[in-house]
């Protein structure tokens, strides 16, 4: 039986392999995602300067006002809409998607699709 620590270590190894190839620039920053059991986080990062340009999570006030759980697909969709809205307000319309070592399924896919529908291109 695979333990939680083993799964997380495997995910982190995958993420390091992905990070070697996926780099955010000033023209196309990186949209990275982190998923925990009860929450989901997304941020747009410029890897050249090492700065976070925009961030959204299931802990934001706008998210909490929607009265949705952060640990399900509906919550991930809401976070995807929030990150896209904030990025478009800052003039960012093209990003590179970094799934963070998670498989493109469930909450990760829901966040990505919602961000695409809200106007982000990747």
From Swiss-Prot:
Keyword rRNA-binding recorded: yes
Pfam families registered for this protein in UniProt: Ribosomal_L18p
Gene Ontology CC annotation, any one: cytosolic large ribosomal subunit
Keyword flag rRNA-binding: yes
Any one GO MF annotation of this record: 5S rRNA binding
UniProt keyword list: Ribonucleoprotein, Ribosomal protein, RNA-binding, rRNA-binding
A single GO BP: translation
Function per UniProt: This is one of the proteins that bind and probably mediate the attachment of the 5S RNA into the large ribosomal subunit, where it forms part of the central protuberance.
Stated family: Belongs to the universal ribosomal protein uL18 family.
Assembly, per entry: Part of the 50S ribosomal subunit; part of the 5S rRNA/L5/L18/L25 subcomplex. Contacts the 5S and 23S rRNAs.
HAMAP family: Ribosomal_uL18_B
Protein name: Large ribosomal subunit protein uL18
